Every structure is written in structure tokens, then in C-alpha cells.
UniProtKB/Swiss-Prot annotation:
Annotated stretches, region: Disordered: 99-140
GO molecular function term, any single one: protoheme IX farnesyltransferase activity
Membrane topology, as annotated: Multi-pass membrane protein
Protein name: Probable protoheme IX farnesyltransferase, mitochondrial
UniProt keyword annotation of Transit peptide present: yes
Keyword entries, A-Z: Heme biosynthesis, Membrane, Mitochondrion, Transferase, Transit peptide, Transmembrane, Transmembrane helix
Main location (coarse class): mitochondrion
EC identifiers of the protein: 2.5.1.-
Class in the EC hierarchy, top level: transferase
Annotated transmembrane regions: 163-183, 245-267, 279-299, 303-323, 352-372, 374-394, 402-422
Protein family membership: Belongs to the UbiA prenyltransferase family.
Organism: Dictyostelium discoideum
Keyword Transit peptide: yes
Role this protein plays: Converts protoheme IX and farnesyl diphosphate to heme O.
Length: 449
């Protein structure tokens, strides 16, 4: 009975009355151990009294049995006490370690969460600061010529297009009929129309420009300039460009050509994701500006303007095919169906070579059939410019170098076509013949009188 009471007391009290610390549990167990030892001494005293009574009653056999039983009970009690002690210490140690580990893990997790939140906040702040710095300091970091608005209008390309229109006017203008006002109108109108076309191009391709490393930093992509404002600005520039030329009746046709060229450029932009033939359609956009200048100079579509337009058209094919080969993977990732993406490199090289070879005899063919009295050096430079585009396929020059060669050869050819121009026979000779006829008629009339 006493043993069962001790075990019940241990099982009931156990960890319930202990504190959370290890030392508190040990103090409790020491007190409990002292109580259990007093119970054992009482059993011993009871054994002694009982043994004396038995000795007096001469019950030796029963006394021995009882003593053996009491000794066994003592052993059981001691064993149970030590087992409970070990289990009790294990429980205290496990609870203390688990509490400390849980507290440490919770502290670590809390610290990690705090650090992650701080890192996220820092990243958001850094991203906001970067966006603000991009929007505010883009002009400072890249310079004025490469600022957001200059990038939006593609200033280098716009200047290039304007120079081709100027070359068309200067090359086609008869000697003595050069007009600086008309040239200024053609230059400004072409410049504004080209700006409008480039803005429309970027506004249409915003979603695709994000996918290309070459165009991912454009102002409409990163949000430096609002798309709605850009669209309104492009319409305003187109209106100003057309009005600058159309205000003069003789320049209404060149102004109409400029406006139609903007519409063609927008249509070509959508075709870049539809068919590989977009390069040949887009080449018309680059061939029209010199025709604008020549029509402004002569008032009609003359042979010199057609030659410059055809030369520009042929020149653009190897030029843009070389660029598409350099940016093949970027075009593929953005979903553009360029010839370099849909066909092998050998096919692209053969197409470029065919156009370059066709451009060599082209100036002399025009001169033979139209006899527009262009300087032979100018014709030779046009042929050499086309030959330079064919040279890389013979010497195995990279497409990137071919692209650079095409950029160098074109302005040289246009400059010489303006510098080495000659008076046109169908202007000077016809005028002289009319004057001679008038003089002869006057002389004949005087003789009759």
C-alpha cells in the first residue's frame, strides 16, 4: 500500500508542480526523496517492533518471511525512486532544451523575417530610387543628344533621313534655280515627319521592345515619357511637317509624300512580326526622302531623283540584313520574323550579295537610258558603294563590320552626288533653244517691216 501511494504521488505531482527551470525540478525531487526515505525508516521501525513481538511470541518462521518481504519492498521502492529520478531529470532536461531551442528558433525566425522585410523594403526603395534616377538623370548620364526625347525621335536616324532629302534637292536642282527657302522647308518638313514616324514606331512596339536588350531602355518602355503624350506629340509633329511644306503650293506633293511615308512606316512596323518580307517593304520608307527633295527641286519626278531613290532602296537591303544577323537572337526572342530568324545564314548572305551586285551597274544603266548628265565620278561612287557591300561576302567580313561599312559609304556617295553635280541638258539646252527661236522670230519680223 505504501509503495502504491508513493508511485501515485510521483505520477500525480511529476512535472506539474515543478518550475520551468532545471534547478527547480531538482529541489522538488530532493524534498520528495527525503519524504520517501522517512517512510522507509518508518517501515524499518515497524519491522523492528514487529520482530520483537514475534520473538516474544516465538514466531521465528513468520518473522523471517515478513522481513524478507519488507526488504524486497524496500528494494522495489528504491528502484522506483531512482527510475523516477532519472525520468524526471530527463523530462526536465528535454523540456528545458526544447523551450530554449524553440525560443532560439523563434527568435531566429523572427530575426530572419525582420531581415527579409528590411531587405524587401531596401530593394523597393532602391528600385524606386533607380527609376527616379533613370527618369531624372537620363539626360545627364547620357548627354543631351541621347536624352529621352532625343531617343524617342531617334535623332541619328532622323538626321540621316533629312540629309538624304537635302541630297535629293541639291542633286536635282538646276543651276541658278537654287532656293534656300525651299531647301529649309524641305529640311524642316522632312525632319518633323521623320520624328513623327519614329515616335509612332516606338509607341507601337513598346511591348516588344521590353524583350530586347537593345531597346529595353527606351523612354516609352521604362516610363520616362507617357505613351499618350508621345502619340499626341507624333500627330502634332506630322501636322507641322506636312504644313511646313504644303504652305507653298509647289511643295504640296513633297509634303504629301512625307505624310504617306509616315503611314507606310507604321504599317511596316506591324509587318515585322508577320512576314520576312518586311525588310523590302520598309526599304521604301528609306527610299522616299531623296525623292521628296528631288520633287521639291524640279516639281516633277525626274531621273536623278529616281536614281537616288533606287540607290537608297538597294543599299538598305544588305544594311538591314546585316543588322538582323547581329541581333538574330534578340529578334527571335521578341517575336520578329526577320529573314535571319526564319532562314539560315547562307540564305541571308546570298540575298545580301545579290542586292549588292545589282547595285553596281545600276547608276550606269540610269545614265544610259535617261542621259541626265550626272558627273561620272558620282556614278562611280554609287557603284563602289554597292561593291563595298558585296566585299564582305568575298573576304568573310563579319555582319557587324558590313553594317559599319554601309553607314560610311552612304554619306560619302550622297556628298559627292551633291558636290559634283552638273547642269542638266534638258533644262539649259531647252531654254537656250527657246531663246534662239524667239530671237530669230524677232529678227525676221524686223526684216519684213
Amino acid at each position: 500500500m505504501m509503495l502504491s501511494k508513493i508511485i501515485n504521488n510521483i505520477s500525480k505531482s511529476g512535472l506539474r508542480n515543478t518550475t520551468n527551470s532545471k534547478n527547480g525540478g531538482l529541489l522538488y525531487f530532493q524534498n520528495y526523496y527525503m519524504k520517501s526515505s522517512t517512510t522507509i525508516t518508518r517501515l524499518n521501525s515497524g519491522n523492528n517492533n514487529y520482530s520483537n513481538n514475534n520473538n516474544n511470541n516465538n514466531n521465528i518462521i513468520l518473522n523471517d518471511k515478513f522481513l524478507n518481504k519488507q526488504q524486497n519492498d524496500k528494494k522495489i521502492i528504491y528502484n522506483n525512486i531512482f527510475e523516477e529520478k532519472n525520468q524526471f531529470l530527463k523530462r526536465i532536461y528535454s523540456t528545458s532544451t526544447t523551450t530554449t531551442s524553440t525560443t532560439t528558433t523563434t527568435n531566429i525566425n523572427e530575426n530572419n523575417i525582420k531581415n527579409e522585410n528590411n531587405n524587401e523594403n531596401n530593394n523597393e526603395n532602391s528600385n524606386n530610387n533607380n527609376e527616379q534616377s533613370i527618369k531624372s538623370n537620363q539626360t545627364k548620364s547620357k548627354g543631351f543628344l541621347r536624352g529621352p526625347y532625343m531617343t524617342l525621335i531617334k535623332l541619328p536616324i532622323t538626321v540621316y533621313v533629312t540629309l538624304t532629302a537635302i541630297a535629293g534637292y541639291v542633286a536635282a536642282c538646276p543651276i541658278g534655280a537654287f532656293d534656300w527657302v525651299v531647301l529649309s522647308q524641305v529640311s524642316i518638313g522632312t525632319f518633323l515627319a521623320s520624328c513623327s514616324a519614329n515616335i509612332h514606331n516606338q509607341e507601337i512596339e513598346v511591348q516588344h521592345d521590353r524583350k530586347m536588350p537593345r531597346t529595353k531602355d527606351r523612354p516609352l518602355v521604362i516610363g520616362t515619357i507617357n505613351r499618350g503624350k508621345a502619340w499626341v506629340g507624333s500627330i502634332a509633329l506630322l501636322t507641322l511637317g506636312f504644313g511646313t511644306m504644303a504652305v507653298t503650293p509647289s511643295l504640296f506633293v513633297p509634303g504629301t509624300l512625307a505624310a504617306c511615308n509616315v503611314i507606310l512606316y507604321c504599317w511596316y512596323t506591324d509587318l515585322k512580326r508577320v512576314t520576312p518580307l518586311n525588310t523590302w517593304i520598309g526599304a521604301f520608307v528609306g527610299a522616299i526622302p531623296p525623292l521628296i527633295g528631288s520633287v521639291a527641286a524640279t516639281g516633277e519626278f525626274e531621273a536623278i531623283g529616281m536614281l537616288l531613290a533606287t540607290f537608297m532602296y538597294i543599299w538598305q537591303i544588305p544594311h538591314f540584313l546585316a543588322l538582323s544577323q547581329v541581333l538574330r537572337e534578340q529578334y527571335r526572342g521578341a517575336g520578329y520574323k526577320m529573314l535571319s530568324v526564319t532562314h539560315e545564314k547562307k540564305t541571308v548572305d546570298r540575298v545580301s550579295l545579290a542586292h549588292a551586285l545589282f547595285g553596281i551597274p545600276l547608276p550606269f544603266i540610269f545614265d544610259y537610258f535617261f542621259n541626265f548628265n550626272v558627273h561620272p565620278i558620282t556614278l562611280t561612287c554609287m557603284a563602289l558603294s554597292s561593291a563595298s557591300l558585296a566585299l564582305p561576302f568575298i573576304t568573310k567580313i563579319s555582319p557587324k563590320r558590313l553594317y559599319i561599312i554601309s553607314l560610311i559609304s552612304l554619306p560619302i556617295t550622297l556628298f559627292l552626288s551633291c558636290l559634283l553635280r552638273q547642269p542638266f541638258a534638258y533644262y539649259t539646252d531647252d531654254d537656250d533653244e527657246d531663246k534662239d527661236k524667239d530671237n530669230q522670230n524677232q529678227i525676221e519680223n524686223q526684216d519684213k517691216k
